[in-house]
Amino acid sequence: MTDEIKRLKELVDSSDNIVFFGGAGVSTESGIPDFRSTDGLYHQEWKYPPEVILSHTFYESNPEEFFRFYRAKMLAPDARPNAAHKKLAEWEAEGRLKAVITQNIDGLHQAAGSRKVLELHGSVHRNHCERCGKFYGLDDILRTEGVPRCSCGGIIKPDVVLYEEGLDQGTLEEAVRCLAAADLLIIGGTSLNVYPAAGLIRYFGGRHLVLINKSPVAQDLAADLVITDPIGETLSQV
């Protein structure tokens, strides 16, 4: 056991109100790439950068291309929870982890057994008709091609926060409440540069901050512990 893992274990064992704040890096070990990572093949297939395609304006003006990208890049129905998801669910079952605040939309925390999951950017598992409000699951989107439509004729929109759209106010308020009450905040798999989500961590006033991320982030200087190993590999040793 490395000194970093020992220290992390000490912090976890001495805390009874842990909050985990995570991003795309939490799910990469489940085989879900960060949609922002583009390569040569990306530019052969898509005319626009992902931030443009995943905007409200693009969704409204070009729904066919939006859903082509959405199915190809945002949905990973075969992905399974990794060691990080499982360890967090275990800590919650023990009563020490009070909430998972995630920027991910894949539902893998719930699949691992986590109950208190605040999804800042929504979920691919929730979809609603824009006209009548009828609910549709992920399977309904996967079963269709092109623009998915409700039986009433309306477009079925994923409950995923697009660029230019606001975050759910109730989810934000609950995230702030959980962060303010936490004594240990573990931030993992996020570069903390997607706002307003990343700005939430300023509401944490607890004793200890841990950062687990492959690349350095500005908050490293304020952290009690910084780990640059993969998050699943790290948490599985605690």
Regions found by a protein language model. Give the residues of each.
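Conserved catalytic core of sirtuin-type NAD+-dependent deacylases
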Residues: 1-238
